[in-house]
UniProtKB/Swiss-Prot annotation:
One of its GO terms (molecular function) is magnesium ion binding. It holds the Pfam family UPRTase. The gene is upp. It catalyses: UMP + diphosphate = 5-phospho-alpha-D-ribose 1-diphosphate + uracil. Pathway: Pyrimidine metabolism; UMP biosynthesis via salvage pathway; UMP from uracil: step 1/1. This is Uracil phosphoribosyltransferase. Uracil binds at residues 193, 198-200. It is an enzyme of class 2 (transferase). InterPro entries: PRibTrfase_dom, PRTase-like, Upp_B, UPRTase/APRTase, Ura_phspho_trans. Its cofactor is Mg(2+). HAMAP family: Upp_B (MF_01218_B). It comes from Nitratidesulfovibrio vulgaris (strain ATCC 29579 / DSM 644 / CCUG 34227 / NCIMB 8303 / VKM B-1760 / Hildenborough) (Desulfovibrio vulgaris).
Amino acid sequence: MAVYVVDHPLVKHKLGRLRQHDVPVSEFRAIANELCRLLAYEATKDLETEKVSVQGWAGPVEVDQIKGKKITAVPILRAGLGMLDGFLDMIPGAKVSVVGMFRNEETLEPVQYYTKLAKNIDERMAVILDPMLATGGTLDATIDLLKNAGCPQIKGLFLVAAPEGLKRIVDKHPDVDIYVAAVDERLNEHGYILPGLGDAGDKIFGTK
């Protein structure tokens, strides 16, 4: 497994805006999707391409196209939906799989309540979308679910991650690559990321 922190001035600037307590819901949504586009760009650098011939304005021309890689986006409900449009802007042909989980606030462990995976998941690269990687419990459970379904390759895109959650995933899933805009300082006693973004789901959906 590799952890890729996308070190770019645009990423830093946009993430800094998300950290501001009074950012409007509409702006939070827009920036979350902008950051997801930048993360998706980095996460797909290793896709193979092949030459194909197309009809250009002056006749046939050889162009590059992605070679036979089927992709499914996997937003984790509900906050992951706030990154989905950005991902599909970059990869409009991707299928969408949905995993519904919430974190038990007492045990901090995930509780699964809904799953709908794309057909032929065993032939697809899955890209998990979630703004926050905190304890790693939800991501761990989602990776297990995808692996049990036969998914051959898994990556994850996150806006911020805590070192504790990253360690959990690195230790258990060394074959999964993680792309993140920032690795924050730590978790607090309630399992929230510091400095973090606050409740990303509430900020995306305007429920608080």
